[in-house]
Amino acid sequence: MALLMTCFVIVFAASQPCQTPDDLVAAASPGHIMIGGLFAIHEKILSSEEPRKPEIQKCASFEIPTFLQTLAMIHSIEMINNSTLLSGVKLGYEIYDTCTDITVAMAAALRCVSKFNSSREIVEFKCDYSNYVPRVKAVIGAGYSEISMAVSRTLSLQLMPQVSYESTAETLSDKIQFPSFLRSVSSDFYQTKAMAHLIQKSGWIIGILTTDDDYGLNTLAVQTAANNVCIAFREALPAFRSDITIEVRINQTLERTIAEAKVNVIVVFLSQFHVFNLFSKAIERNINKIWIVSSWSTSTIATIPDVKRIGKVVGFTFRRGNVSSFQSFLQNLCVFPSDNNKPLNEHAMLSACAHAKDSDLSQCVSNCSQGTLATKDSERNFFLRTDFLWDYTELGLVHSIQLAVLALSYAIQDLQADFQPWELLAVLKNVTFMEGWSSFHFYAHGAMNTGYNIVLWREINGHMSIKMAQYDLKNDVFIVTNQETKNEHRNLKKIQSKFFKECSSGQMKKTTKSQHTCCYECVTCPENHYSNQTDTDHYLLYNNETHWAPVGSTMCFEKEMEYLDSLAILLLALSLLGILFVLAIGIIFTRNLNTPVVKSSGELMVRYVILFCHFLNFAGTGFFIREPQSFTCKTRQTLICMSFTLCISYILMKSLKILLAFSSKLQNFLKCFYKPIPIIFTCTGIVVVCTLLIFAAPAVGQNVSLPRVIIFECEEGSILAFGSMLGYAAILAFMCFICAFKGRKFPENYNEAKFITFGMLIYFIAWITFIPIYTFGKYMLVVEIIIILISNYGICCMFFPKCYVILSKQETNTKSVFLKMIYSYSPHSAGSLAMSHSNITITNRTSAGGSAVQQKSRDLQLQGFAHICRENAMCRTKALPPKRISSI
């Protein structure tokens, strides 16, 4: 066997030089409809030097796997001709050898598009090839993507269908550049997607070996990036074997592979030639890795000696079909003298020389090439040695060639008349046919819905492969058929190919600055993030409105619902204490109604209304502490605001009533506003605001902004309405503060201006502090309750001095003491009034006439002090000395 293989690849096994256009044809058979075929039957062109003449080079190094592919096309066409699919129509073929060279392939493409039945083999130039009749109607091939691209640009000029059986480059899916290109296999997009899927699920860090052309390089990069596959290194080998640096680059690649000791998985996206040389040298260096090999390389692996020493090889192969008839075809293969099949004759020649010694090998090949073998057996068929051919058959490619021939045949069946290639292309794109139990068709981008098989190259009973899974293109999943292959698939995923130990649950991978993009460190998940998987590179998401997670958590927790806090006990205690104070003040005032201190506080209704408002303010804080309900949510703010407003209004009325007696300007100013329209407008606005706050506000809501709890709280509704109520109360408080401040010089036992001023200052400070705080947070309501308590206690201060006098200084709570205070204040007040009267008299004397306004002001001033006396029950006219009364 080794001698036979040596004979197949020696330089003497070269094709004949091209003398005439017919010499370019490797195999041919006539028919009504001709199909072209492009196959790399020879590995390379013979000359490695720069060409000096525009002539087609000789080919060298006979390739058995590709030779078998040409036989697969011939067999498939014969199967169609022997069937009833194309009744009365015979398919013919012309197969060309591309020699793995673009120039030779272009020469074959030119012959395919040359004019039919033309003795000169010319390609006519036309602006419109709609009615042009070329030599062939369609082309099957080529194998290499680079060659298919070059050929497709020529065939696309006439929109001649080109169906490749092996070209998988994703670039060929571009229908703008390659409008007539189709393929009976899936594109690299799906193959690389399947590879990236397998690698990502296994968590491997990989190395990538590719060629420096379009084959898989760009698509693989896109898919690995999309699946977050970590690439430790990447090496690119020269695409063409004629490159003199290829051996050096292979050695450098293997050295890099050895240096990356922790990278145990290598993805190989190379051609058969590259894989054969790479693996052969890797076996010599005892490199043991996991090799993931693309579909182009799988047929080569079985031919590599001692390939099992290289480690595990996982191959992606084209999905296989029923090719049993082709096996029978090979077993009965023979050479007919009349056959126009140069590859078959070359195979027969090399088979005949397999027994020759090295010294006689050259002479044997020379004799065979002169046709002595054919003349010797011209009377009978020459049966070939075919016992080894099946081992070199790539079943997936054979099936792809069968599908290509079938697709063309079904498209021709739909036409069944004289047609042009572009008409065949239109039908071919939409053809659907059955092969076995499967239905096949072309996608819009030109690939067929075939898929891939994943095989593990391992020797079992003399065979070098075992199917592990099938890749489903549509659902992006691996389908495992039996338990044995499932175990193999599971064991494959257990292989370690990582730089670091995997991160535990509650951690994630974070990329570090290193020469490798895959280096990472394990970092603990921060608060409100979690990870329940090992070796993950991202945090898991959850609904942070309803759940939370601590630092380094492996799971998330549901937020607890809260509406009470231990601080509420303290606030309730302060509220109850305030209620007790109000009740105590009410009791004290009730028991001392007829004392001067109580009477000096104002009218009876005013006193009790103010105390009742304080009571409501303290009691209203309870609506903020209990569980939120619709009624409490809608009424609590309104209750507090109205209580404060009513309380401050009565205090303002009390202060303003006295102040008016001494200010004529204030009386004139208030006359402008003391009219029905302003009063009705203001009161109506207050009612509307309160109504909106009660009925238009949402009742109960949830505050989900806190990290670990959900606050069950009331929603305040319209901020504008709420602010309007607070603003109105603030305006009243400010007016009350001004009036109290202006009346601070009145008799102390009668006047409460100092304490009202103090209470209003506390009120302002508290609510001004509340504005920036009342925005957000768990303790927002706590702050509001504290502000309410502080401001309410501050206003209550106006009652504390009177209670102190009633309880502790009863000797000052007498009529005589109050009369004495009035008497001591009266000379000062009367003197001021007399001085004012004198000034008015002097002014009147110097003026031409008197002013009625000045006279009225003087009368008001005289009445002011009398009003003070009337407010006090103890102030009587008979108690005053006659001189002081007459002086006023």
From Swiss-Prot:
GO biological process: regulation of testosterone biosynthetic process
Spans traversing the lipid bilayer: 569-589, 605-625, 642-662, 677-697, 719-739, 755-775, 780-800
Residue positions with a glycan: N251, N322, N532, N544
Cellular location(s): Cell membrane
GO cellular component: plasma membrane
The keyword Glycoprotein is assigned to this record: yes
Keyword field contains Signal: yes
Database matches in Pfam families: 7tm_3, ANF_receptor, NCD3G
Gene Ontology MF terms in the entry: G protein-coupled receptor activity
Membrane topology (Cytoplasmic): 590-604, 663-676, 740-754, 801-888
Segments on the Extracellular side according to the record's topology features: 16-568, 626-641, 698-718, 776-779
Annotated signal peptide: 1-15
Protein's membrane topology: Multi-pass membrane protein
Function (record text): Receptor activated by multiple ligands, including osteocalcin (BGLAP), basic amino acids, and various cations. Activated by amino acids with a preference for basic amino acids such as L-Lys, L-Arg and L-ornithine but also by small and polar amino acids. The L-alpha amino acids respond is augmented by divalent cations Ca(2+) and Mg(2+). Seems to act through a G(q)/G(11) and G(i)-coupled pathway.
Stated family: Belongs to the G-protein coupled receptor 3 family.
Stated name of the protein: G-protein coupled receptor family C group 6 member A
Species assigned in the record: Bos taurus
Name of the gene this protein is made from: GPRC6A
